[in-house]
């Protein structure tokens, strides 16, 4: 399983938890990790070291590239985001649109947007852990790996559900309207869906008859022999020159 990390490398994003369990995760043999980002020097050096120590397990790009970030979102199977706090978070939403399942800590916007997988009902489109604890994070990663390797149909269904999740303003606006309606006690006006007006039978028959008559007329017109039109030369013909001949008088000799 390929796990992606696209983030600022800071404590707020939970990299102290990752640092604590990175050695164990690299030795687990069940995943590969790709990291993209810049931040605190200690974490930049941490990923440089592990990409040198486990070159076939971990790849670290200590930079930021929007183009590369989208390639990571698209290529990975899971996306790790163990933030200490997260007011909203966009990376988990972007990853879901690519069918990459987020592994997150239940805080702020991560808790609001990532519904954890329920093995009994099949609901959800991600994996989450509650406490800011490295062991819980690792256990959550292992749970995701178990589904990925041992229950492919469930994993594929989670991907479909993740890609179908809608966090657009259309949905948010509807929720705000419902909230204001509840607070104020003013009922929302019901949406009036107008059914398409069907033409009356008489009008429908009239249109059919007109179309039929028009097609009949076109057939008759096309069957007529073409009219031969004499085309006159618009330019006058040049006048013919007449030759004048003179008769010579001859005298007979006597």
Give each language-model segment a name.
Residues 8, 36-38, 63, 105, ...:
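Cofactor-binding loop segments of dinucleotide-utilizing enzymes, especially the Rossmann-like FAD-
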Residues 29-71:
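Nucleotide-activated donor-binding/catalytic signature segment of Leloir-type glycosyltransferases, i.e.
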Residues 243-246, 250-251:
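Low-complexity, polybasic segments enriched for Lys interleaved with small residues
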């Amino acid at each position: 399983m390929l796990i992606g990390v696209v983030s600022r490398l800071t404590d707020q994003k939970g990299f102290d938890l990752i640092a604590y369990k990175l050695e164990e995760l690299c030795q687990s043999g069940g995943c590969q990790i790709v990291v993209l980002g810049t931040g605190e020097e200690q974490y930049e050096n941490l990923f440089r070291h592990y990409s040198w120590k486990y070159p076939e397990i971990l790849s670290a790009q200590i930079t930021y590239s929007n183009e590369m970030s989208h390639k990571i979102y698209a290529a990975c199977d899971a996306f790790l985001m163990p933030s200490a706090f997260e007011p909203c978070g966009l990376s988990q939403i972007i990853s879901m649109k690519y069918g990459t399942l987020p592994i997150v800590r239940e805080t702020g916007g991560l808790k609001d947007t990532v519904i954890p997988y329920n093995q009994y009902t099949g609901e959800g489109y991600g994996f989450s852990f509650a406490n800011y604890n490295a062991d819980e994070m690792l256990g959550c990663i292992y749970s995701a790996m178990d589904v990925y390797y041992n229950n492919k149909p469930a994993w594929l269904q989670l991907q479909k559900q993740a890609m179908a999740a809608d966090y657009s303003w259309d949905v948010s606006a509807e929720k705000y309207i419902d909230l204001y309606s509840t607070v104020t006690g003013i009922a929302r006006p019901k949406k009036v869906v107008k059914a398409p007006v069907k033409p009356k039978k008489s009008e429908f028959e009239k249109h059919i008859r007109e179309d039929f008559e028009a097609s009949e007329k076109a057939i008759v017109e096309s069957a007529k022999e073409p009219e031969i039109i004499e085309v006159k030369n618009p330019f006058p013909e040049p006048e013919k020159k007449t030759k004048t001949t003179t008769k010579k008088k001859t005298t007979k000799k006597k």
